[in-house]
Amino acid sequence: PELRIAFEDHIRTVAGHYRGRVYAWDVVNEAVDDSVAGLRSTVFSRGLGPDYVAEAFRLARKADPEAELVYNDYGGEGLNRKSNDVYTLVKDLKQRGLVDGVGLQMHISASSFPAVADIQANIQRLADLGLQVNISEMDVRIKDVAGDAATKLARQRQVYRDVVAACVAVPRCESV
């Protein structure tokens, strides 16, 4: 009961305090597990059950009905198990009228990142759900790229260029 009370009070207090003044809320961040299908084992999933994500969005919607509500996660840039789990989660939330957008965190390596076509396909399938898509975080590591500094930086520029192009190609991808 204490966790539920704190969970509900926090969302109501923060979203309610800024009601009408904040464009969008990242309501839930990084809930999908990296290693196994489904949600990560956290204090919230263990203490409140698997529907805590939907409950957080319900509470946020009630506290600030005009704000865009966003689910945000990393590791699902292209088409993979994690991006499929994120897709399944936000599809369910969208069908319930709870989520408006999804943020994709891209912490990627210039030496091994998803194919640009896969990144664009993932953005497109999220947009096809009626969601606004944002690349909410992005960094491109160059430590493992072979070559001198100029070569590494050129590769990094190309990765940034490719990801931005993938976003721009999908009308509902709003920002990088």
Residue locations for each model-derived region?
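Structural preference for beta-strand elements that scaffold enzyme active sites
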Residues: V22-D26, E66-V70, V99-G103, G130-I135, ...
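Substrate-binding cleft of secreted/luminal carbohydrate-active enzymes
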Residues: Q156-V176
